[in-house]
């Protein structure tokens, strides 16, 4: 087990500014053994295997681990996505070859995009193939957004590739746990 700076001083500063740790821990087997990884919310750990040059984009907090052959950087998105989309201002971009392990809150919902535009709640997006283009748009019907539990913004994906989504957003999960705790506290 060895702590190391990823991408040198500049890479470490970018990671720190993106809300991630400047240091990563590297594990190398000297004999048979295993390393366990887990997210902080109930959910799934999903391996994403990338061939040489293949790119994958994930939300900032989804990254758990990667093989040392995988390169990763941060990618910024528009201010609309940052403040209203739930995705955050900074995304992580991974370039193969190698396997990246990401954490998905709840179950994994996989969307195959093949040309036709697909709208997804930005708070549910865990990661997607970099072959896809996406933009954040305002929901057409404000009444549906307010009373339908959808949110004010949607991410529209076009192109060809896959989007991996959370079955429940982190914000919704946290709110449900908080509300359940409040109801339990008031019953005592």
Range-by-range predicted roles:
Residues 1-188:
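Phosphate/adenylate-binding glycine loop and adjacent helical scaffold
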């Amino acid at each position: 087990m060895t702590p190391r700076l990823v991408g040198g001083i500049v890479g470490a500063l970018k990671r720190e500014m993106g809300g991630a740790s400047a240091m990563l821990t590297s594990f190398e087997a000297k004999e048979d053994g295993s390393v366990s990884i887990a997210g902080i919310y109930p959910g799934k750990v999903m391996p994403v295997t990338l061939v040489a040059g293949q790119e994958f984009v994930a939300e900032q907090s989804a990254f758990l681990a990667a093989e040392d052959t995988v390169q990763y950087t941060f990618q910024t998105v528009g201010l609309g996505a940052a403040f209203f989309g739930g995705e955050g201002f900074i995304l992580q971009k991974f370039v193969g070859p190698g396997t990246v392990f990401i954490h998905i809150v709840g179950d994994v919902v996989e969307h195959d995009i093949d040309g036709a535009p697909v709208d997804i709640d930005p708070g549910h997006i865990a990661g997607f193939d970099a072959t896809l283009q996406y933009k954040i748009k305002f929901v057409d019907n404000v009444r549906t957004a307010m009373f339908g539990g959808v949110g004010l913004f949607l991410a529209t994906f076009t192109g060809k590739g896959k989007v991996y989504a959370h079955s429940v957003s982190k914000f919704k999960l946290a709110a449900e746990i908080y509300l359940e705790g409040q109801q339990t506290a008031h019953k005592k």
